[in-house]
Amino acid sequence: IIMPSAFIGFDAMGAMTTDKRLKDLQALLGEGEELDYTKYCRPFGDNMGLVVGESSGFVILMSDRLALEVGANIRGCILNVNINADGNKKSISGPGAGNYFSVGKTFMDVEEVFGDKVLKENSAFIAHGTGTPLNRITESHIVSTFAKEFGIESLPVTSLKSKLGHTMGSAGMDQLFGALG
């Protein structure tokens, strides 16, 4: 649910994008004077801040046996659950040891289950990608660190927030749906 207090808080931190920021950036990049709202959130480019969005979703989980028994359309499997919540601060979260642990463990899980070749040649990374300058720097650093450590030369990275905005509580669901297609 989009609440006014969320807008006020993000704006107070300077994390929200604004028409003025968009207009200034478009002028700097020579993108014309008419505001192009499709470029409002730029997670990996010239960052202006996040856009609040709204979504919801659900996933039905079942064992392999049950899925085959009922003829379910199997879209993926859960290898492991690696999570880190660092939003307990009164400022924009920066990467801590938990962030590195979660991402590193995920790389290890993919390599262990699917092998080195799949990890290096057939993987993609759906980033949190809020569109704030701090997120771009910290998230890019974490992903680059592990890609290098695991010998990955090219790792496609994307974020759905450039199209959906930051949907807060359901942002992880958006990313899951993006991964499953």
Predicted regions and their residues:
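Acyl-CoA/ACP chain-elongation machinery
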Residues: 1-51, 81-95, 129-136, 153-181
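Glycine-rich, phosphate-binding/catalytic loops in enzymes
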Residues: 10-13, 76-77, 141-144
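An N-terminal domain-start capping segment
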Residues: 98, 121-140
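Surface-exposed alpha-helical interface segments used for non-catalytic interactions
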Residues: 99-101, 141, 174
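Condensing-enzyme catalytic core mediating Claisen C-C bond formation in acyl metabolism
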Residues: 22-118, 123-124
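Buried hydrophobic packing segments
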Residues: 60-63, 106, 143, 173-180
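Glycine- and aromatic-enriched membrane alpha-helices
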Residues: 136-154
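Alpha-helix capping/termination and helix-coil
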Residues: 107-114, 129, 133, 147-151, ...
